[in-house]
């Protein structure tokens, strides 16, 4: 089974899969060993690994290289976070050609204007017009060479302060333009607008994807009951690694020794195993 077929099966309506946000080959292998179904090549994670904001700073080539390493390091399908598609329809078409050629299973593009800002930060968010983003999706689908390559349309209506009716209108238009799945994003604390969207979505043949970063009390099972088939845990691995590295390194500088952290860190044999 190809990785693209694996991704299509993972997001198919009727089941519930989970994806881990990863930012390099090591985090990809750890996610695979933990039992995740899909890898999310996180734009935030890749940007953070380069110590730059998630604001369209890195180039497509840099994001693609990170996704390629993840793909080559594991047996799991990679769904790549491609922000707004790195430009207009021509840029989107080239992006699809490059990602598909690299073996990536699918891409996700969001309906914000370029350059984008991270959805969970402060400040206003500007959405692309429905027609403009639909044209990008159509260009993406026209550019793909294999039938099973996946293009996910990410809707930022709730992030931009919009209402469910706009989100559904956008979803309908994006599916008509060729989107294989819809990702609806939100930074609500309770996730109720996401669950409401899922229950209101009438296209039962089109998969729904959620990213429960700001509403962690909503479980994957809760999302499944509302009609979703993929939950992306987009940045938890990144945040966990920051906490662990910070605590360990501060302990070393305080003690002038690594003795007290040794029971808390991975053994070298575990590192070697991850380099298999």
Curated annotation (Swiss-Prot):
<protein>
    <recommendedName>
        <fullName>Phosphoenolpyruvate phosphomutase</fullName>
        <ecNumber>5.4.2.9</ecNumber>
    </recommendedName>
</protein>
<keyword id="KW-0413">Isomerase</keyword>
<keyword id="KW-0045">Antibiotic biosynthesis</keyword>
<feature type="active site" description="Nucleophile">
    <location>
        <position position="54"/>
    </location>
</feature>
<comment type="pathway">
    <text>Antibiotic biosynthesis.</text>
</comment>
<dbReference type="InterPro" id="IPR039556">
    <property type="entry name" value="ICL/PEPM"/>
</dbReference>
<dbReference type="InterPro" id="IPR040442">
    <property type="entry name" value="Pyrv_kinase-like_dom_sf"/>
</dbReference>
<dbReference type="InterPro" id="IPR015813">
    <property type="entry name" value="Pyrv/PenolPyrv_kinase-like_dom"/>
</dbReference>
<dbReference type="Pfam" id="PF13714">
    <property type="entry name" value="PEP_mutase"/>
</dbReference>
<dbReference type="GO" id="GO:0016853">
    <property type="term" value="F:isomerase activity"/>
</dbReference>
<comment type="function">
    <text>Isomerase involved in the biosynthesis of the phosphonate antibiotic FR-900098, a potent antimalarial agent that acts as an inhibitor of 1-deoxy-D-xylulose 5-phosphate reductoisomerase (DXR), the first enzyme in the nonmevalonate pathway for isoprenoid biosynthesis. Catalyzes the conversion of phosphoenolpyruvate (PEP) to phosphonopyruvate.</text>
</comment>
<dbReference type="GO" id="GO:0017000">
    <property type="term" value="P:antibiotic biosynthetic process"/>
</dbReference>
<comment type="similarity">
    <text>Belongs to the isocitrate lyase/PEP mutase superfamily. PEP mutase family.</text>
</comment>
